[in-house]
Amino acid sequence: MATTMMTSSASPPESGELDVASAVASAAAALISPMVMPTSMTNGKDMTKTSQILNEYFNMMVGKRVQLMGDTTSPFSLDTPNPKLMFTPLDLPTTAELMQRCLAVNPFEAKFREANQKISSGSMQPNTSGANQSLEALEANGGSQFSGSNAGTMSDLLLKIPQASLQHSPGIFSNMLLNAGDSEGTTRENLKTADISKLLSVAGDFSAQAPRTADVLNAVLDMHSDRLHTINYLNNKPDFSALLRSPSSSAPNSASVLTNAMAIPSTSGAPFPGTTLLVPPKTVSSYHSPLGASSQPPSTQKSPADGSWDHINGEKQIKKEIPYFNDDAMMLMERSNMSSSGSDQDQSADMSNAGSTASTSTGNPVGRPQNGTPGRGRGRGRSTTADMQPDERRNTILERNKAAAVRYRKRKKEEHDDMMGRVQAMEAEKNQLLAIQTQNQVLRRELERVTALLTERESRCVCLKGVPMSDEQHADHHHRNTNGMYSGSDMLNGLGQINGMQLKLPKLQ
């Protein structure tokens, strides 16, 4: 150690530059080597090549330094090696290229590829240990593979990242670096060391508060699974709820969530206790169903062996199962009956006769529907043409249509006549109002003319003018009326106006 220190101290002054260059090369190799270790990244080959170049440069610098220490007499030993003389410009990347490659690295790809490799190789265990044990027991007993039969449920469990690996998952904002500095007018060239450390500390605080990528992926998988179970997509899949239940785990993990989702009641008719909540009753009465007894399953019909079944009840049941049809439906039935056989017509006639017998025996009022459904139309019940032959029924319906058309035309004519009468009455009233308005205008013009004549006559009247007085009398009269409101000349003229009103004054003596 002492020899080395003496040798280094005895080295020429230019060895300081060599020490600085070697230190820079070692620092660059130490900084770049952690980033290029995962070769599974997108540009892993380029980063590996860059690391190899830097390592060779570092080894060469160390060897050159040893050579300089061993032989200090050579005049060329003090020259600093130039990288441009040893490498071509394409082999040694610049700092900007290194930074660009570092920024282009996807931080998620290495983790995702590693997780996919673990899932493919089978070394990665999902969160549900009880589910895996149950599946292994099922496969050991000769059961089928779970992934092929129920791909919609267990695939989500395999894709989900376990809780133990969540802390190693990168944050969702980890790939956002210092690009936000441009918004404040500063660029990456103008940033100082203090600014960079401040931005890094702020980014670290944000990344610590932000959720991680694994949390986001697990939440998306849970939402997808819940949506599939909500739309009843996975109810036809095999039910592994008994296998997925883990008695040791008390926390609601993914397997328990899927188990609760698969326990949703459905109408598939499976013999599970939970399926009786939404399953409709098996016995559907004809009151709620528009179909007859012939279209219902055999289990819903009563057998003659039942104790509560007798001939009268049978007739009532048959009568209730006959639906109600209006005239339009009967016209459609006529067309279908034209192509049917005579046996069907006889059967329908027998059913109608049985229905009439039942209505007579029960004592229902006339016009009330017998099938249990409320009557349509004008309160009448079942159509009376149901018991007729097709030709007779057609003629009856045509006669009804003709009578209805006549009544409609008559009612329409009456409404039209009533409307025309109202129009004529309104026209007469309008003419009367116009005549009254014209008379009112004539009277107004006559009043204005008479008022103008009266005003003109009053202005020409001389009865209010008195006898002319002498100068002394006029002066004395003016002196007496000086303190009054009006002068004597105004009073003599007879046109004195008090508050805008024309008043006739008495004659002066």
UniProtKB/Swiss-Prot annotation:
Q: Which portions of the sequence form the region Leucine-zipper?
A: 419-450
Which UniProt keywords are listed? Answer: Chromosome, Nucleus, Transcription, Transcription regulation
User: Where is the protein localized?
Assistant: Nucleus; Chromosome
**What ranges does the record give for the region Disordered, renumbered to this chain?**
283-318, 337-400
What is the reported phenotype of gene knockout?
RNAi-mediated knockdown increases susceptibility to infection by the Gram-negative bacterium P.aeruginosa. Up-regulates expression of metallothionein mtl-1.
User: SMART domains under this entry?
Assistant: BRLZ
Q: Which InterPro entries match?
A: bZIP, bZIP_sf, bZIP_transcription_factors
List all Basic and acidic residues biased stretches. Answer: 308-318, 390-400
Q: Compositional bias of type Low complexity: which residue ranges?
A: 337-364
GO biological processes: antibacterial innate immune response; cellular response to metal ion; cellular response to reactive oxygen species; defense response to Gram-negative bacterium; negative regulation of innate immune response; negative regulation of transcription by RNA polymerase II; positive regulation of innate immune response; positive regulation of transcription by RNA polymerase II
Q: Which GO terms describe its cellular component?
A: chromatin; nucleus
Q: Where is this region: Basic motif?
A: 393-413
Known Gene3D superfamilies for this protein? Answer: 1.20.5.170
Q: Name one Pfam family in it.
A: bZIP_2
| Occurrences of domain bZIP (ranges) | 391-464
Q: Where is the sequence biased in composition, kind Polar residues?
A: 283-303
A Gene Ontology molecular function term of the record: DNA-binding transcription factor activity
Keyword Nucleus found: yes
Query: Which PANTHER family does UniProt cross-reference here?
Result: CYCLIC-AMP RESPONSE ELEMENT BINDING PROTEIN
Q: What does this protein do?
A: Transcription factor which regulates the transcription of various genes, including those involved in innate immunity and oxidative stress responses. Binds to promoter regions of genes, probably at 5'-[GACGTCA]-3' consensus sequences. Together with transcription factor daf-19, involved in regulation of the serotonergic response of ADF neurons to pathogenic food. Modulates response to infection by the Gram-negative bacterium P.aeruginosa, acting downstream of the p38 signal transduction pathway effector serine/threonine kinase pmk-1.
- Summary of subunit composition and partner proteins: Interacts with serine/threonine kinase pmk-1; perhaps in a manner dependent on dual specificity protein kinase sek-1.
What family does this chain come from, according to its entry? Answer: Belongs to the bZIP family.
Mind telling me what this protein is named? Transcription factor atf-7
What species is this protein from? Caenorhabditis elegans
